[in-house]
Amino acid sequence: MKNKLDLSLYLVATKGSKSEECFLNTLENAIKGGVSIIQLREKELNAREFYKLGLKVQKLCKSYKIPFLINDRVDIALALDADGVHLGQEDLEAKLARKLLGDEKIIGLSLKKLEQLEFIQGVNYLGCGAIKATPTKESSLLSLELLSQICDKSPIGVVAIGGIDKEALVELKGINLSGVAVVRAIMDAKDAFLAAKELKRKIYENLSLK
């Protein structure tokens, strides 16, 4: 799977205050609109709740044949036999996650500095941002210049994340990205299908999808 990874429209999904039914409907509509990969990110759920929700999201992703990743929690990814995991710089090292998950699973890594490219052994793609201020990352912005440098030097695909919407995609034109990751642009949209469809159109218009 990692050799044919479509990162073009990457959804980071958090249930938040939505009902489970509404959450799963949002994800299904987003997939129908063009989402190519889903990462389940649940910081507020305990392990059992995360696992139970993960089972349902995994079933949905399997039915549409798109990859399903878990944020941070290698243990949950293992328990679910998810397609992979996305790690932050303070999570378990990628090489250890690779040892636990095996060669066929997808491992993504958050990255903000050029020098961190030295430590991406065993990683399939990079997530870089935030591109714009978000409620959780107001003080950790990544300049477009640095993002471009990381993309040019990275031997693996790079996904931009953080405050990305239709307008931001125009600003990313010319940068060698493999895709963009969104949260609120789809999860908070009135119509997840239309939001995803419009984002996908803008992605194809503006990104080379390296």
UniProtKB/Swiss-Prot annotation:
CDD domains: TMP_TenI (cd00564)
SUPFAM superfamilies: Thiamin phosphate synthase
Pathway: Cofactor biosynthesis; thiamine diphosphate biosynthesis; thiamine phosphate from 4-amino-2-methyl-5-diphosphomethylpyrimidine and 4-methyl-5-(2-phosphoethyl)-thiazole: step 1/1
Domain of life: Bacteria
Residues that hold Mg(2+) according to the record: D72, D91
A single GO BP: thiamine biosynthetic process
EC number(s) reported in the record: 2.5.1.3
Keyword terms: Magnesium, Metal-binding, Thiamine biosynthesis, Transferase
GO MF entry, a single one: thiamine-phosphate diphosphorylase activity
Coiled-coil annotated residue ranges, if any: none
Chain's role: Condenses 4-methyl-5-(beta-hydroxyethyl)thiazole monophosphate (THZ-P) and 2-methyl-4-amino-5-hydroxymethyl pyrimidine pyrophosphate (HMP-PP) to form thiamine monophosphate (TMP).
PANTHER family in the record: THIAMINE BIOSYNTHETIC BIFUNCTIONAL ENZYME (PTHR20857:SF23), THIAMINE-PHOSPHATE PYROPHOSPHORYLASE (PTHR20857)
Protein name (database record): Thiamine-phosphate synthase
Organism: Campylobacter jejuni subsp. jejuni serotype O:2 (strain ATCC 700819 / NCTC 11168)
Gene that this sequence comes from: thiE
